Curated annotation (Swiss-Prot):
InterPro entries per record: ET-Flavoprotein_bsu_CS, ETF_a/b_N, ETF_b, ETF_beta_N, Rossmann-like_a/b/a_fold
PROSITE patterns per record: ETF_BETA (PS01065)
Record PANTHER family: ELECTRON TRANSFER FLAVOPROTEIN BETA-SUBUNIT, ELECTRON TRANSFER FLAVOPROTEIN SUBUNIT BETA
Keywords, sorted A to Z: Electron transport, FAD, Flavoprotein, Transport
Pfam families referenced in this protein's UniProt entry, alphabetically: ETF
Entry protein name: Electron transfer flavoprotein subunit beta
SMART domains: ETF (SM00893)
Superkingdom per UniProt: Bacteria
Similarity annotation: Belongs to the ETF beta-subunit/FixA family.
Source species of the chain: Mycobacterium leprae (strain TN)
Cofactor: binding comment: Binds 1 FAD per dimer. Binds 1 AMP per subunit.
Length: 266
C-alpha cells in the first residue's frame, strides 16, 4: 500500500498580467486569474498512475493533495480532486501571507505530519510564480527523508522508489527507500482532463482545513514580517512600444547598426 501526498499550489495564470502589490511587494494574487499550477497537475497525474498500477495488483493506496493558501486556493484543490485524488488538506491561515520558501517548507512539513501513513510525497520541481525550485528539498530536510528531485520518470516497487533525473551531463538513475520526497519535471507525463463524473465527485470529497496553531507553527515563525528574504523595492516594467521602423534606401544596414549602438546592444 502506497499512501501518497501531492503538494499543489494555486498560481496566477501565466497568460494573465502578474504584478506585485504596492504595499508589501508580495505577489498580487487578486489581480490575475488563478489556476492549479501545470507542473502540479503532472504531480497529481503521477500519483494517480501509481495508485492505479498498484490497484491492478490488489494493492490499495490513497492520494491526498496538500496546499497552503487563502480561501481561493479551494479552486485548485477541487481541480486536483476532480482529476481523481481521494482527499485534500488545506493549510489556510492569514499568518502565512508573505512567507518565504524556508517558512513555507517548514509549515508544509508540519502539515504533512498531520497526514497519517504518508509513504511518498510528490511535488512539482518549481512553481511558475516563484520559480524557486527548493521547497521539496527543504521539506525533505525538515522531515529527515531522502529526496529525489527533478525526476522525469518514477517507479515504486518493493518499498523503494526509483527515478531518472536528466541533466546536461547525462541521465542519472536515483533510488531511495520509502518514505521519500520527490519532485517531477514537465517530462514526467501528460495530465488527464477531469471527467464530468470526476468534477461532480470532487464536490463531495473530504477537505480538511488546518490553521497554523493546529500544526504547531507559531505566528512568529512564518509570514512577511519574519521572512528571511523579502522584496524592498519594485519598479514596473516599461510599457511595450511599437519600436522603430527603418526604411531601407540603400543604407538599411547602417541604420540598424546605429540603432543597436544607441540602445547599447553593441
Amino acid at each position: 500500500m502506497t499512501n501518497i501526498v501531492v503538494l499543489i499550489k494555486q498560481v496566477p495564470d501565466t497568460w494573465s498580467e502578474r504584478k506585485l502589490t504596492d504595499g508589501d511587494f508580495t505577489l498580487d494574487r487578486e489581480a490575475a486569474d488563478a489556476v492549479l499550477d501545470e507542473i502540479n497537475e503532472r504531480a497529481v497525474e503521477e500519483a494517480l498512475q501509481i495508485r492505479e498500477k498498484e490497484a491492478v495488483d490488489g494493492i490499495k493506496g490513497s492520494v491526498t493533495v496538500l496546499t497552503a493558501g487563502p480561501e481561493r486556493a479551494t479552486e485548485a484543490i477541487r481541480k486536483a480532486l476532480s482529476m481523481g485524488a481521494d482527499k485534500a488538506v488545506h493549510l489556510k491561515d492569514d499568518g502565512m501571507h508573505g512567507s518565504d520558501v524556508i517558512q513555507t517548507g517548514w509549515a508544509l512539513a508540519r502539515a504533512l505530519g498531520t497526514i497519517e501513513g504518508t509513504e511518498l510525497v510528490i511535488a512539482g520541481n518549481e512553481s511558475t510564480d516563484g520559480v524557486g525550485g527548493v521547497v521539496p528539498a527543504i521539506i525533505a530536510e525538515y522531515l529527515g527523508l531522502p529526496q529525489l528531485t527533478h525526476l522525469r520518470t518514477i517507479s515504486v516497487e518493493g518499498g523503494k522508489i526509483t527515478g531518472e533525473r536528466e541533466t546536461d551531463e547525462g541521465v542519472f538513475t536515483l533510488e531511495a527507500v520509502l518514505p521519500a520526497v520527490v519532485s517531477v519535471n514537465e517530462k514526467i507525463n501528460e495530465p488527464r482532463f477531469p471527467s464530468f463524473k470526476g468534477i461532480m465527485a470532487a464536490k463531495k470529497k473530504e477537505v480538511t482545513v488546518l490553521t497554523l496553531a493546529e500544526i504547531g507553527v507559531e505566528v512568529d515563525e512564518v509570514g512577511l514580517a519574519n521572512a528571511g528574504s523579502k522584496v524592498l523595492v519594485s519598479t514596473p516594467k516599461p510599457a511595450k512600444t511599437a519600436g522603430e521602423k527603418i526604411t531601407d534606401e540603400g543604407d538599411g544596414g547602417n541604420q540598424i547598426v546605429q540603432y543597436l549602438v544607441a540602445q547599447k546592444i553593441i
